[in-house]
Structure formats: C-alpha cells, structure tokens
C-alpha cells in the first residue's frame, strides 16, 4: 500500500510496533500520509519521532518537505544540510529536488529551472516516479515565474501523467489545477476556472490543499465575480489556519475582495503603503500624488483620488484622464470606479447618457487578446507586478501592441438609433431614464421600478395585459431600450410596443437587407424530442449534436441558430452564464470566441441571461424570455417565431405572452 496513493487507508492500517526498523517504516509512512492530507503538524510529529528513533536521513528529508510547505525555509534548509552527508543515489537526487524547490520559492526561477532540469534527468534514471513528478511540478512553478507559460503547462501535464500512472490521482488533479493557474497567468480566466472545476471533479481535495482555493478566489476576483470570490476565500482562510500554513497574499487578496464589494474594513486594518488601501482610508492627497508616476493601476487610482478631491469640473476631467490611461494600456481596475464617480456628477440628459454608456462598458472581457504578442506582453506585465519588479517598459510594450492589434467584438463606434431611445441607469439606488426622441434628450426619475417589474411578470404569467408602458416608454410604436438593474427582468415585448432591448448603444446595429441564411437547430439534454424536429422539417437546415465543439463550429457564420437547451445565468458576469449540453456547459466566453457569430439566435428553453454573450460577440438579434417557459407551450410558440424570423422584433412580439423579447437590433429592411 502506498502512503501517497491512499493516505487515509495507510493511516487506518499502520501501527507503530515491531522491530526498530518496522517502527521506523511505520512512522515514515504515517508522516508521508499526513503530509498528503495536509496535516502538517501531525506529519511533523511522526517524522520527529522517527528521527529520534533512528536518526535516518529520510526523516530529515520529510521534515525539510514539511517545513518548506509551511513556509519555514531556513528550518527546511537546515534539515537538508543535516541529511546531506548521509545521502547517496536516489536519496541525494531527492534532496537536490528539494533545493530546486527552494530556488522557486526564493524567486530565482532561472536557477531553479537549471537545477530541476538536472534533477529530472537523475530521477528518470533511477525510475523514481513520485519524486520525478515533484521535480516537474517545481520546474513548472519556476517556468510560471519566468513567464515561460507553454513550457510550464507542459511540465504540469507531464507530472499529471506520471502521477496518474502510479495511482496518485489527488496529486494528479492538483497538476490539472496548476494548469488552470497557467491559464490565469496567460489572461484566460474562463479557461482557468474551467480547469479549476475539472481538477475538483478529478479528486482535488481542497481541505488538504487550501491554497487551491486561494488560486480559485484570485481568478474569480479578476473575472469580476466578487461575491463568489469571497465565498471561496472564507473557508480557505480557516483551512490554512488549521493546517498551520502561511500564504502571505491571502490577507491582501481578502482585503481587496472585500474592498471591491464595498467593505473597506479589512483594507483599513491592513493599512501600509498599498495605494488602493490608502484610497480606502481617505488619504486622497497622498494617492493623487501618484497620478503621474508608477504603474498604470497606481496612476489610475491617483486620478480617481484627484476626482474625489476636486470640484465637479475638475473631477470630470480627472475621470476622463484616468479612463484614457486605462484605454491606452488595456487596464481594468479602477475603470468602474471612475465611471461611477463621473456618473454621480452628471447633470444634463446628454451627460447622464454619456457616462451611463461608459459605466455599462467598464467591464473588461476575461478573454486573452487574439494577438499572441499582446497576450505574452500582458503576461510578462502581470508577473512583474506580482514580483514587485519594474513595469514601465512592459506597460509601453502593452500599449504599443494594443494600438497595433485594435479591438474585436462589439464595435467601438456608437451609432444612435433613429428610433426613439430610452436609456435607464441605476446609480446609488436611484433609477433615472434618458429619453431621446427626434434628437431631443430628456432626463427623469423613474420611481417604483421593482413594483412595475413584479406586476408585469405576474400579469404575463397570468395571461393578463401589462400596463407598465406609460411609466417607462415614450409614446411610440417602436422603441430601443437599454435597461438597468431590475429592469433586466422586464418582459419588454409584453408592453404592447415593438421593443429592441440592447445592453448598450455599442450593441445597436443599423437595419440592413435580409439575405439567404443557413439555419442551425440544437436540442440539449432532455429536450431532443421537443420542438426542434418539427421546426427543422418546416424550415430546413442542419440539426447539430449537442456537444460544445460541434455547436461552436456550426454557429460560425450561421444565419439563424435555434437552441433548445436549459441554462444558468450569472448576473455578475454574463460571460460565465452557460447552456447545458451533453458534454457539459457551453459558457458565454465560448460564444465570445466566435469569429463569425450567427445573425439571429433563438433561445427557447432558457432565460435571457445568455443573450448578452451573443450580442457581445456580434449577433444582431436574440429572441429569449425573462420567464420560465412551460415545455408544453414552446413548440407552438416557436413555430410562430420562425415564420417571422426575418424581423426578430415582430417575431418576439407574437410570443410576448410567454415573456419573450427581442434583444439587439430586431429590424431588417426587406430585400
């Protein structure tokens, strides 16, 4: 029985008895088993008993590993020094592996890579598979620190293969988790989160490896999913305390997470010279002094502090300066804070419309840029920041490559619709609406919106007329609406108008002539025998097997895509909403990768949260419901929709009684 492959069984089956040699073996097995379970204090006690019993060098090696895991580097090195004179062959190679791991922790990645590369050759020669995996993992960590991400991923993959072959599936799952960390460094947050999830499913036990929770929380926070990040950090903190492990970045990460969730308490308690925490403490003059020097994020925080200490005119100028800086360097934080501050200062209808648009588009996509050079430059910049190194030259590289790459996805050019427009915006609990009709803009407060939405949804569910149009919309047959807050849940088409619902003005596409289109039909698990076969028979087109790769390939360049699949909405970040397919979820970020997104999408079996991902990718119109749709009524409803699909806003209107609306530009000019 292997103490590493099945540590719990080892603990249950092992007794410290017999001869001196048998007792020493038992103590060593128990120590290693408890290391695997993250019980470092217990593991250390068994190893110390073995050391007192025999003085064998293997116990020094085990204690060196335990102390390294605890962050006690000097004690770990002392054990290695004591063991060194007694080591030969395989044991000596293991000690060299531990010294290589020390170099990783000492932020000397190139020395660590060289040392571990030599050790890997030795361990392969001895056939020491478990320690070979240790060395590969260590070299992968060193290559992460050196921003050699492809090679790091290869090392973690190789270690995963070795560990699976010797039956250490929990540690193999940790290697998959490490590959998620590589994806996070590369800027691909969705891939990072997917690998973290896959690692957990593969057997990664976060109770014995709570640092995995810290990695996951960091990715969630970077993706803007602050609530989820805080949920993950809370048990991580308790587990690390129980395991007597020190993760220095945990307190800072926890404070940042709380700060971005509106709780400055932890940041104020940490204090120090961190600019973000100084801003939370109200030290505006000190932070504003950073707006002309230092890393981009520090300068942007300086402009935010300048805005907070200035009069209205100066504050708006400071917000614009901070946003220009972030635009030049593809920066994110504190973009949303800058736009929120400016929105609070906006007075006229045009100002509110402008800053509301800036605020709506203040979330950066968690996808890596399509230009490999830019992706690499951003990776190098992230690592330099993490290690406290110089970043100004790297920021210049990012700016240069960003300007050369340009943007992809939603167009940056804003075209105001010729139709009447209503832009709703919530700021500090207050709902306001900017109405633009015939070029004239008007600003007004909109009270009791939650009640209006609730009454409208109840009316639709009961089959009654909805009476909220007068309170929300101008007197026009056709209107463009940009909702905010609870109004995202409004069944807009049920208000008796032809309503185009868009996330922001950047999503409006001028109407264009219809053209022959390719139709794609997709039915998810449990819905294969519902409306899709009948629709395909009437309208033609291809029916696609509900596997993610097949679905994505079929959607490229399609005219109309009909998806009958259940889904789940993530309100914090729509790119993490998903559809359920046979091989797992199809995320919004998968849709965002489409080079040629479909023209029109119909989501017949899930609520409208995923519409945003299609519109961000470039789809012109999405027909979806804000209410659960009874399966018994879907088939007849979808027949009516597809007979009018060339005019999506009219197609949505005929099924408004089921809560469907048209998201995007739902008008075309007939051929």
Labelled PLM ranges:
Residues 484-486, 533-609:
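Catalytic-core segments of thiol-dependent peptidases
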Residues 22, 55, 91, 131, ...:
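Structural signature of alpha-solenoid helical repeat junctions
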Residues 569, 575-597, 631-671:
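Caspase-like cysteine protease fold
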Residues 25, 58, 65, 94, ...:
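Residue register of alpha-helical TPR repeats
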Residues 482-560:
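Catalytic-core domains of enzymes
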Residues 8, 276, 301, 312-496, ...:
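Amphipathic alpha-helical protein-protein interaction segments
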Residues 14, 18, 34-35, 54, ...:
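Eukaryotic all-alpha helical interaction scaffolds
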